[in-house]
Amino acid sequence: MRWLDGTVTVEDSVGSSISLGGDLLRTTFLPSITTVTLGLIRMRDRSLRLGPIPLITFGPPKMSSTSVSWPIEGGLLVASAGGRFTIESAGGHLRATLDGYRPMLPRAIYEATQLRLHHGLVRVQLLRLAGLPPSQAQPSPVSRAAATAIDAAVCAGLALVFARRHRVRVFTGIAIGYHLASWSTSGTTLGGRVMRQRVASIDGSRISLIQSTLRLAALPLSALRRYPAHDDIAATTVVKDTPV
């Protein structure tokens, strides 16, 4: 990240096993924000919108054989028009660069809030487009189910110990905090440790708090669709945690 005269330049990059053309990047990257925000933010009329509110409005995109770039023209999160947002597929990497953007928020608040969300969501989108195979061997469905059962038992036990009333609410709160803390620190819960498995980004790296939050929020969708939509949305996978 670099600041210059009130404008900021931010870059995120992930390895990629495929090469993507500029037109494909144009039609997939920004629209996929709807998926990774679970419908909260949508791309419409070249604007990223939260409900009816345009957060960032872009001008017409410019494309090359390996990249697409949108000029920034306005929106609630933009202090003044200027700068560009570019996605490039080259050299075995997918790279997103926000260059010359002037945020509406003061620098300290921007760095503590919007910048963190930007890094987290952009990285998820890049990983989802990167076409990477799982970095390690994956545990069997039976092993995953056993780990889930252990974690549910742990959370239920804590709820029984610490709550005499509203145990369902307490169980829910404990389960949320337990999984978010476990996934975004070590990648593994108590059930995962017992069954020797952990959650990782699809490139093998530790998952972020944003990925953990997306994964947990999308779990009901996985149950409805009967496939791991939570891993697809958060760009995560469960891998065997082999002792060194």
Label every PLM stretch briefly:
Residues A79-A112:
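Beta-strand/loop substructures that line and gate deep hydrophobic ligand-binding cavities in soluble
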Residues R49-G91:
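Hydrophobic-ligand binding "helix-grip"
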Residues A108-S135:
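A conserved amphipathic terminal alpha-helix motif
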Residues V8, V68, L94, Q197, ...:
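A broad, low-specificity signal marking well-ordered, structured residues that form hydrophobic/aromatic
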Residues A96, H118, D151:
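Hydrophobic pocket/interface hotspot
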Residues S13, E73-G75, A90-G92, Y101-P103, ...:
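Generic structural motif
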